[in-house]
Amino acid sequence: MPDILTASQMRALETAAFNSGAVTGLELMERAGQSVIDALFSSKAELATGEHRAVILCGPGNNGGDGFVIARLLFVLGWQVRVYLYADPEKMPRDAHANHDSWVDLVPECTQRISFPSVLPAEAERFGDEAFGNGEVDVIVDALFGIGLNRPLSGLHPILATCHANRHEAYFVAVDVPSGLGENGPLEAADWSVFPADLTVTFHRPKQAHQNGLSFCGKIMVQYIGL
Protein backbone atom coordinates (compact mmCIF):
# COMPACT_ATOMS: atom_id res chain seq x y z
CA MET A 1 0.00 0.00 0.00
CA PRO A 2 1.54 3.36 -1.01
CA ASP A 3 2.08 6.02 1.63
CA ILE A 4 0.13 8.58 -0.41
CA LEU A 5 -3.14 7.55 -2.06
CA THR A 6 -4.99 8.79 -5.10
CA ALA A 7 -8.75 9.19 -4.93
CA SER A 8 -9.28 6.00 -6.93
CA GLN A 9 -7.00 4.00 -4.62
CA MET A 10 -8.89 5.22 -1.55
CA ARG A 11 -12.24 4.37 -3.11
CA ALA A 12 -10.96 0.90 -3.98
CA LEU A 13 -10.00 0.36 -0.33
CA GLU A 14 -13.44 1.44 0.84
CA THR A 15 -15.19 -0.76 -1.71
CA ALA A 16 -13.11 -3.78 -0.69
CA ALA A 17 -14.00 -3.18 2.97
CA PHE A 18 -17.71 -2.91 2.15
CA ASN A 19 -17.68 -6.01 -0.05
CA SER A 20 -15.90 -8.06 2.61
CA GLY A 21 -18.49 -7.14 5.21
CA ALA A 22 -15.80 -5.62 7.45
CA VAL A 23 -17.70 -2.34 7.73
CA THR A 24 -20.82 -0.68 6.36
CA GLY A 25 -20.97 2.71 4.73
CA LEU A 26 -22.88 4.12 7.68
CA GLU A 27 -20.33 2.76 10.16
CA LEU A 28 -17.46 4.23 8.16
CA MET A 29 -19.19 7.61 7.95
CA GLU A 30 -19.74 7.60 11.72
CA ARG A 31 -16.07 6.78 12.30
CA ALA A 32 -15.00 9.53 9.91
CA GLY A 33 -17.17 12.12 11.62
CA GLN A 34 -15.96 11.14 15.08
CA SER A 35 -12.35 11.17 13.90
CA VAL A 36 -12.73 14.76 12.66
CA ILE A 37 -13.95 15.81 16.10
CA ASP A 38 -11.09 13.91 17.76
CA ALA A 39 -8.59 15.68 15.51
CA LEU A 40 -10.22 19.06 16.15
CA PHE A 41 -9.99 18.65 19.93
CA SER A 42 -6.42 17.38 19.65
CA SER A 43 -5.46 20.39 17.57
CA LYS A 44 -7.43 22.98 19.61
CA ALA A 45 -7.69 21.61 23.15
CA GLU A 46 -9.65 24.64 24.38
CA LEU A 47 -12.57 23.54 22.19
CA ALA A 48 -12.93 20.20 23.98
CA THR A 49 -14.75 21.77 26.93
CA GLY A 50 -17.29 24.52 27.37
CA GLU A 51 -19.89 25.96 25.00
CA HIS A 52 -18.88 26.63 21.41
CA ARG A 53 -20.43 27.35 18.05
CA ALA A 54 -19.86 25.61 14.73
CA VAL A 55 -21.06 26.18 11.19
CA ILE A 56 -20.97 23.09 8.96
CA LEU A 57 -21.01 23.35 5.16
CA CYS A 58 -22.39 20.09 3.73
CA GLY A 59 -22.18 19.12 0.07
CA PRO A 60 -24.10 16.66 -2.11
CA GLY A 61 -21.99 13.53 -1.60
CA ASN A 62 -20.56 11.37 1.15
CA ASN A 63 -18.34 14.23 2.31
CA GLY A 64 -21.58 16.01 3.14
CA GLY A 65 -22.71 12.90 5.00
CA ASP A 66 -19.57 13.14 7.14
CA GLY A 67 -20.54 16.74 7.83
CA PHE A 68 -23.95 15.74 9.15
CA VAL A 69 -22.31 13.23 11.50
CA ILE A 70 -19.98 15.98 12.75
CA ALA A 71 -22.94 18.32 13.26
CA ARG A 72 -24.87 15.72 15.24
CA LEU A 73 -21.95 14.71 17.44
CA LEU A 74 -21.03 18.32 18.23
CA PHE A 75 -24.65 19.13 19.05
CA VAL A 76 -24.80 16.19 21.47
CA LEU A 77 -21.67 17.60 23.13
CA GLY A 78 -23.52 20.85 23.77
CA TRP A 79 -22.33 22.94 20.83
CA GLN A 80 -24.53 25.38 18.95
CA VAL A 81 -24.49 24.05 15.39
CA ARG A 82 -25.78 25.49 12.14
CA VAL A 83 -25.68 23.48 8.89
CA TYR A 84 -25.68 24.98 5.41
CA LEU A 85 -26.69 22.35 2.86
CA TYR A 86 -25.42 22.79 -0.69
CA ALA A 87 -27.43 19.90 -2.16
CA ASP A 88 -30.82 18.41 -2.82
CA PRO A 89 -31.04 15.92 0.07
CA GLU A 90 -33.24 13.59 -1.98
CA LYS A 91 -30.38 13.16 -4.46
CA MET A 92 -27.65 12.49 -1.91
CA PRO A 93 -26.11 8.99 -1.69
CA ARG A 94 -28.00 6.62 0.60
CA ASP A 95 -25.71 6.83 3.63
CA ALA A 96 -25.31 10.59 3.36
CA HIS A 97 -29.07 10.97 3.04
CA ALA A 98 -29.57 8.82 6.16
CA ASN A 99 -27.25 11.07 8.16
CA HIS A 100 -29.01 14.15 6.79
CA ASP A 101 -32.30 12.73 8.05
CA SER A 102 -30.83 11.87 11.45
CA TRP A 103 -29.62 15.44 11.84
CA VAL A 104 -32.85 17.06 10.67
CA ASP A 105 -34.90 14.80 12.94
CA LEU A 106 -32.72 15.87 15.88
CA VAL A 107 -32.58 19.62 15.18
CA PRO A 108 -34.97 20.54 12.35
CA GLU A 109 -34.55 24.29 12.77
CA CYS A 110 -30.76 24.33 12.36
CA THR A 111 -30.36 23.51 8.66
CA GLN A 112 -30.34 26.15 5.93
CA ARG A 113 -30.58 25.10 2.27
CA ILE A 114 -28.54 27.14 -0.20
CA SER A 115 -29.14 27.09 -3.93
CA PHE A 116 -27.53 24.26 -5.87
CA PRO A 117 -25.53 24.38 -8.07
CA SER A 118 -25.20 28.19 -7.95
CA VAL A 119 -25.37 29.99 -4.62
CA LEU A 120 -27.22 33.30 -4.77
CA PRO A 121 -25.37 36.41 -3.57
CA ALA A 122 -28.09 37.04 -0.97
CA GLU A 123 -27.56 33.52 0.42
CA ALA A 124 -23.82 34.10 0.73
CA GLU A 125 -24.50 37.39 2.50
CA ARG A 126 -26.84 35.63 4.92
CA PHE A 127 -24.23 32.93 5.50
CA GLY A 128 -21.63 35.61 6.24
CA ASP A 129 -23.91 37.44 8.65
CA GLU A 130 -24.93 34.28 10.52
CA ALA A 131 -21.47 32.70 10.56
CA PHE A 132 -19.34 35.76 11.27
CA GLY A 133 -21.61 38.70 12.03
CA ASN A 134 -21.53 38.48 15.81
CA GLY A 135 -17.93 37.30 16.07
CA GLU A 136 -18.88 34.25 18.12
CA VAL A 137 -18.36 31.39 15.66
CA ASP A 138 -15.53 29.09 16.73
CA VAL A 139 -15.29 26.57 13.90
CA ILE A 140 -16.26 26.43 10.23
CA VAL A 141 -16.27 22.88 8.81
CA ASP A 142 -15.90 22.26 5.08
CA ALA A 143 -17.76 19.04 4.28
CA LEU A 144 -18.65 20.16 0.77
CA PHE A 145 -16.48 18.03 -1.52
CA GLY A 146 -13.88 15.39 -0.77
CA ILE A 147 -11.11 13.79 -2.78
CA GLY A 148 -11.46 13.27 -6.51
CA LEU A 149 -13.11 16.59 -7.37
CA ASN A 150 -12.22 17.49 -10.97
CA ARG A 151 -14.30 20.56 -11.80
CA PRO A 152 -14.18 24.19 -10.66
CA LEU A 153 -16.65 25.21 -7.97
CA SER A 154 -17.89 28.34 -9.73
CA GLY A 155 -21.34 28.00 -8.17
CA LEU A 156 -19.77 28.19 -4.71
CA HIS A 157 -17.65 31.28 -5.33
CA PRO A 158 -19.79 33.55 -3.10
CA ILE A 159 -19.43 31.18 -0.12
CA LEU A 160 -15.71 30.59 -0.65
CA ALA A 161 -15.07 34.31 -1.04
CA THR A 162 -16.97 34.99 2.19
CA CYS A 163 -14.84 32.41 4.02
CA HIS A 164 -11.64 34.04 2.77
CA ALA A 165 -12.87 37.51 3.71
CA ASN A 166 -13.36 36.25 7.27
CA ARG A 167 -10.23 34.11 7.29
CA HIS A 168 -9.18 35.04 10.81
CA GLU A 169 -12.62 35.04 12.44
CA ALA A 170 -12.82 31.28 13.10
CA TYR A 171 -10.91 27.99 12.96
CA PHE A 172 -11.44 26.46 9.51
CA VAL A 173 -11.52 22.65 9.26
CA ALA A 174 -11.63 20.69 5.99
CA VAL A 175 -12.94 17.12 5.88
CA ASP A 176 -10.55 14.97 3.81
CA VAL A 177 -9.43 17.80 1.51
CA PRO A 178 -10.24 21.51 1.21
CA SER A 179 -13.04 22.00 -1.31
CA GLY A 180 -11.73 23.42 -4.58
CA LEU A 181 -8.48 21.45 -4.37
CA GLY A 182 -8.15 18.74 -7.01
CA GLU A 183 -5.75 15.85 -7.17
CA ASN A 184 -3.21 17.91 -9.12
CA GLY A 185 -3.68 21.16 -7.23
CA PRO A 186 -6.23 24.00 -7.16
CA LEU A 187 -8.94 23.70 -9.79
CA GLU A 188 -8.90 27.46 -10.39
CA ALA A 189 -6.15 30.07 -10.32
CA ALA A 190 -7.58 32.32 -7.61
CA ASP A 191 -6.47 31.43 -4.08
CA TRP A 192 -9.95 32.27 -2.74
CA SER A 193 -11.45 29.49 -4.90
CA VAL A 194 -10.17 26.90 -2.38
CA PHE A 195 -11.58 26.60 1.14
CA PRO A 196 -9.03 28.19 3.52
CA ALA A 197 -8.28 25.34 5.93
CA ASP A 198 -6.38 25.73 9.18
CA LEU A 199 -6.76 21.98 9.71
CA THR A 200 -7.38 19.24 7.17
CA VAL A 201 -8.50 15.89 8.59
CA THR A 202 -8.04 13.02 6.18
CA PHE A 203 -8.57 9.29 6.54
CA HIS A 204 -6.31 6.21 6.40
CA ARG A 205 -3.46 7.82 4.41
CA PRO A 206 -2.46 11.25 3.08
CA LYS A 207 -3.83 11.92 -0.39
CA GLN A 208 -2.19 13.11 -3.58
CA ALA A 209 -4.28 16.29 -3.45
CA HIS A 210 -2.61 17.27 -0.18
CA GLN A 211 0.86 16.97 -1.67
CA ASN A 212 -0.13 19.21 -4.59
CA GLY A 213 -1.86 21.79 -2.43
CA LEU A 214 -0.02 21.93 0.88
CA SER A 215 -0.40 25.69 1.22
CA PHE A 216 -4.20 25.32 1.25
CA CYS A 217 -4.44 22.50 3.79
CA GLY A 218 -3.08 24.02 6.99
CA LYS A 219 -2.16 21.30 9.45
CA ILE A 220 -2.86 17.83 8.03
CA MET A 221 -3.96 15.12 10.45
CA VAL A 222 -4.41 11.53 9.26
CA GLN A 223 -7.05 9.60 11.17
CA TYR A 224 -7.38 5.82 11.02
CA ILE A 225 -10.94 4.58 10.56
CA GLY A 226 -10.47 0.83 10.43
CA LEU A 227 -9.93 0.13 6.75
Curated annotation (Swiss-Prot):
Q: Look up the record and name the cofactor or cofactors this protein needs.
A: K(+)
Can you give the residue ranges of the YjeF N-terminal domain?
10-227
Record InterPro entries: YjeF_N_dom, YjeF_N_dom_sf, YJEFN_prot_NAXE-like
- For the ligand ((6S)-NADPHX), the binding residues are 62-66, 146-152, 176
Asked whether the keyword NAD is assigned, the reply is yes
What are the protein's UniProt keywords?
Isomerase, Metal-binding, NAD, NADP, Nucleotide-binding, Potassium
> Which parts pass through the membrane?
none
Pfam families tied to this protein: YjeF_N
Query: Residues that bind K(+), according to the entry?
Result: 63, 142, 179
Give the top-rank taxon of the lineage listed in the UniProt record for this protein.
Bacteria
What is catalyzed by this enzyme?
A: (6R)-NADHX = (6S)-NADHX; (6R)-NADPHX = (6S)-NADPHX
Name of protein: NAD(P)H-hydrate epimerase
Q: What organism is recorded for this protein?
A: Roseobacter litoralis (strain ATCC 49566 / DSM 6996 / JCM 21268 / NBRC 15278 / OCh 149)
